[in-house]
Amino acid sequence: MQKALSILIPCYNTYCVELVRQLAEQCENIEGLHYEIIVADDGSCDEHIRMRNKEILELDYVVYLMRKENVGRARIRNFLAQQAQYPTLLFIDANMVVPRADYILNYMQLSDSTRVAYGGYLLAQGDESNLRYCYERAAGAKNQLKERIKQPYRKLRTSNLFILREVVRQCPFDENLHQYGYEDMLLGVQLQKANIPIVHIENPVLFYRYESNAQFVRKTEESLRNLFLLRQRIGDFSQLLNTAKTMRAWHVDWIYLNYWRRKQQAWKAQLCSKAPNLNVFKSYKLGYLISLFAATDSNQPTNGCHAV
């Protein structure tokens, strides 16, 4: 059984006082546990939320660090790991809820040999008109424990991640990623290459805040730009990337790209409507990714072929 824990919460424009109180209460109820909770505000632009989050300083063993500038999801996590005083870390996103009273205990009861563990996530009921909710719900079956165990390195999220500090030092979050998206998948690639096993358990956090459809489409485009930048390192981890590469290998990507360009604005409007369609979302993402490849091709001399 683990004896010490540093709970690390990266925060950006999110009120997280209730989450911190809940985690602190669970830690207090575990006899003999040495713990700390470190919240790092990553240069939030909402000053009201930054000030409200100072309420957590009323709690014992809680540290609140307010950064002046936003440094991104990877760098803030590396920073948190550097600040931790204990060798065992638990990353939780500030916009999550802990739905069970034994959440911390379940991680503490892991074998001392466990280096990385992931507990999964649940979805709070959302609106059928919300694209993010519909997308996460459709993906839910693939993220059940039995499915995660089949693909331990691909089914990993940093929003609920138990990891040893030494592993973060060996496989740090890539600070070249300044935008949102695919840092989880890249970590899975790094852990697999380092032969560091991931233990999957049923110990979820609850996802309950769903951004607007327009915001989610923008975040998706941002994440696809990350995926494109990481295309060599991620390899076959991404099914979407594999599809785009196959279409390029068969030289049919330009056909789809021309179709996507004609449909782009209409599809985007549909996704931002009150009845978003997941098939349209899938098609939009593929076209957007192919367009990134095409933009690179147009900046380089070719002999009629293009590199995958």
Regions from the PLM with identified roles:
Residues 179-187:
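Acidic donor-binding loop at a coil-to-helix junction in glycosyltransferase catalytic cores
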Residues 23-66:
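Acidic donor-binding segment of Leloir-type glycosyltransferases
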Residues 97-132:
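Conserved donor NDP-sugar-binding/catalytic core segment of glycosyltransferases
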Residues 89:
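Short aromatic/hydrophobic "clamp" motif used to bind/position activated sugar donors
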Residues 222-225, 241-308:
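Non-catalytic, C-terminal membrane-associated alpha-helical segments of glycosyltransferases
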Residues 144-163:
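A recurrent flexible, glycine/aromatic-enriched loop bordering the glycosyltransferase active site
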Residues 67-84:
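Glycine-rich, basic loop-to-helix element that forms the pyrophosphate-binding segment
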Residues 1-25:
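N-proximal low-complexity "stem/linker" segments adjacent to membrane-targeting elements
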